[in-house]
Amino acid sequence: MARGQPRRSEEQWTALQNRTECKTKIKLTRCGKITLGILTAVLAAVLIGLIAYFAACGKDSFYYHVSFKVNNIDYDSKFAKPYSQEYMDLNKRIVSLMNETFHESKLRKQYVKAHTVQVSKAKGKVVIHAVLKFKACYRNNVEKYWESVETTLYQKLKGQTGLLIDSSSFKFSDIAMPIAEDLLNTCCGRRTIIHRGHKVAGGQDAEEGEWPWQASLQQNSVHRCGATLISNYWLITAAHCFIRAANPKDWKVSFGFLLSKPQAPRAVKNIIIHENYSYPAHDNDIAVVRLSSPVLYESNIRRACLPEATQKFPPNSDVVVTGWGTLKSDGDSPNILQKGKVKIIDNKTCNSGKAYGGMITPGMMCAGFLKGRVDACQGDSGGPLVSEDSKGIWFLAGIVSWGDECALPNKPGVYTRVTYYRDWITSKTGL
């Protein structure tokens, strides 16, 4: 029994220990509840703050239009061309000024971007027209936000900026989102998607927004030809697309990279075919199409730049042809827009006996490979052949016209040379 006494003592200790642990657990549980309550309150506050922030600074944006005269910059006619070096240099200067203005202000977290949308003339000096984009905050006090942006910009322009701003010419107003986005995307030859490679016959799928000037000409809801957007009203395409049907009522236009999901569909108001085009000859294979209503520019719908009549696209330079044409002669048409990188071939080579034997005239140009591989094909007709300059701007060099089948050796694609018809385009469209 003597060995039983420690056991009773052990039992007493165990019971005491259990009671002590129980009390400790109760205390920890109470502390845990307090801690949990504090954490819950903090998380709730953070969540409410985030909700409040996104309610005040959501996906919507504020847009403003500003214009002002600059007294120390003489107007140059080249400012009328958004792709000219003079225009781009001036735009860069204005955008830098806007960035500096708002990045150094209390609006720096809301400021998104600025862009010069037009340069006009007043008494021999330039007038800047720009659009500003801000995150939409202070929704309950739009006027206060408007005044804050205006005051910040006006005070900056009055100071030492390197530009002599005529303060009396300063104008500031808000602008609706669709119009603002149209203006922000109005520059020709620009795109938001960077190409990853090119393969049309022997081609490769394009990405959404990669070739935003590409349009589909549809007769009775069926894709017949490609076309290129050159303004918010005008498209340019091949005359031979209309040899069987030239009534505008029979045609529709859509954009986007999927034929199955057309974007911005438009009716056709007018079709103007070159007066000297005569099928089956290939000369003067050019036409312009006027839309019934203008398209609004956005990231996926933009215009290509029209080259000047004197602009050169040298032999062996890279160009890209796009379209929904068949992937091989007499093949099926794809749903996804196709792209193909080819090279310009000089007319002398293209007119050789092995190639087209003298059929290439000055109003035509060849592009592709003498070995074949990549080429435009049926259904690509009227679509763009575009060239990228050193500044990353895309110009319309050619219009898909004709060829001997698709991607055959010594039979590259033949295109209408846009520079040759530049004056004709201006006479019909004013562009």
Curated annotation (Swiss-Prot):
Disulphide bridges: C225-C241, C350-C366, C377-C406
Domain of life: Eukaryota
Family matches, as InterPro entries: Pept_S1A_HAT/DESC1 (IPR017329), Peptidase_S1_PA (IPR009003), Peptidase_S1_PA_chymotrypsin (IPR043504), Peptidase_S1A (IPR001314), SEA_dom (IPR000082), SEA_dom_sf (IPR036364), Trypsin_dom (IPR001254), TRYPSIN_HIS (IPR018114)
Outcome (variant: K199A): Reduced autocatalytic cleavage. Strongly reduced autocatalytic cleavage. Strongly reduced autocatalytic cleavage
EC primary class: hydrolase
Membrane topology recorded in Swiss-Prot or TrEMBL: Single-pass type II membrane protein
Entry comment on modification after translation: Proteolytically cleaved via an autocatalytic mechanism.
Gene3D superfamilies: SEA domain, Trypsin-like serine proteases
Gene Ontology BP, a term: self proteolysis
Residue intervals annotated with topology Cytoplasmic: 1-33
Residue ranges constituting the Peptidase S1 domain according to the UniProt record: 200-430
Location of this chain's protein in the cell: Cell membrane; Cell projection, Dendrite; Perikaryon
PROSITE patterns (UniProt xref): SEA, TRYPSIN_DOM, TRYPSIN_HIS, TRYPSIN_SER
Membrane topology (Extracellular): 55-431
Keywords on record: Autocatalytic cleavage, Cell membrane, Cell projection, Disulfide bond, Glycoprotein, Hydrolase, Membrane, Protease, Serine protease, Signal-anchor, Transmembrane, Transmembrane helix, Zymogen
Sequence similarity: Belongs to the peptidase S1 family.
SEA domain: residues covered: 60-177
Identification of the protein by name: Transmembrane protease serine 11C
Cellular-component GO terms for this entry: dendrite; extracellular region; perikaryon; plasma membrane
Function: Serine protease which has a preference for Arg or Lys in position P1 and uncharged residues in positions P2 and P3. Shows specificity towards FGF2 in vitro.
Swiss-Prot/TrEMBL site (Cleavage) positions: K199, V200
Ubl conjugation in keyword set: no
Main location: membrane
CDD domains with a match to the protein in the record: Tryp_SPc
Species annotation: Mus musculus
pH dependence: Optimum pH is 8.
Catalytic residues (UniProt): H240, D285, S381
